[in-house]
């Protein structure tokens, strides 16, 4: 049986396909699928949008309304705070990996927002936490290892979060040489 792999290249608008360094992304729709368009949730920030993608709920319904927020009963939440992102009390709704696991379908996640927390007592069967020192190539190698596992332990649903393009864009500007170079590093990693 095949596996579903959902890869997010954070902050990658469709016109990045025109930068010329994306042959793997151009090839992928022929072998898999690609969204024709997306309407971001509001606010258009990483954590609210990524959790919306895996729950199907708007941020005001799943509770992750910003990358930084405060709740009088829980305290503060910052995307960079490992303890906060691992606290299941923040994460409402049911992400697809929880639904999969509840139905006997193994799942895995490489740093997808929400995957660090036990949600309803369930986490992905395999999981890697956010670590910006791990390259896109190593992350994809980990996914390949998951896919190469024996059938009885192989995940059938995998989510992978790649933040490098977003970081380069914030640091140097959307049309900077650094963004083009970062895109040129990420895309070959996905297709290797």
Give residue spans per PLM region:
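Sparse, context-dependent recognition of short Cys/His-centered cofactor- or disulfide-binding micro-motifs
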Residues: 2, 10-13, 36-38, 49, ...
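Short, structured active-site-proximal loop/turn typified by the sulfatase FGly-forming signature C/S-X-P-X-R
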Residues: 15-62
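Beta-strand elements within well-structured catalytic alpha/beta cores of enzymes
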Residues: 2-14, 27-29, 53, 100, ...
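Short, structured coil/loop segments at alpha-helix boundaries
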Residues: 22-26, 150, 176, 191
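Secreted, luminal/periplasmic, and some membrane-associated catalytic domains
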Residues: 36, 81-83, 192
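Solvent-exposed, acidic/flexible segments
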Residues: 2-6, 14-22, 39-47, 86-93, ...
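A fold-wide structural signal in alpha/beta-hydrolase
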Residues: 3-5, 34, 106
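His/Asp/Glu-rich, glycine-adjacent segments
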Residues: 57-185
């Amino acid at each position: 049986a095949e596996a579903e792999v959902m890869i997010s290249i954070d902050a990658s608008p469709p016109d990045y396909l025109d930068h010329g360094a994306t042959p793997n992304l151009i090839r992928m729709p022929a072998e898999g699928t690609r969204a024709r368009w997306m309407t971001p949730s509001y606010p258009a920030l990483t954590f609210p949008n990524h959790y919306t993608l895996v729950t199907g709920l708007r941020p005001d319904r799943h509770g992750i309304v910003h990358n930084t927020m405060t709740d009088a009963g829980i305290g503060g939440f910052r995307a960079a705070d490992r303890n906060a992102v691992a606290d299941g009390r923040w994460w409402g709704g049911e992400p697809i990996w929880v639904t999969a696991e509840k139905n006997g379908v193994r799942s895995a996640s490489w740093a997808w927002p929400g995957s660090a927390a036990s949600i309803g007592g369930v986490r992905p069967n395999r999981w890697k936490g956010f670590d910006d020192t791990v390259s896109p190539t190593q992350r994809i190698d980990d996914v390949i290892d998951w896919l190469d596992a024996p059938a009885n332990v192989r995940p059938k649903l995998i989510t992978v979060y790649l933040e490098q393009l977003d970081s380069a864009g914030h640091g140097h500007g959307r049309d900077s040489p650094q963004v083009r170079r970062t895109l040129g590093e990420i895309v070959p990693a996905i297709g290797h």
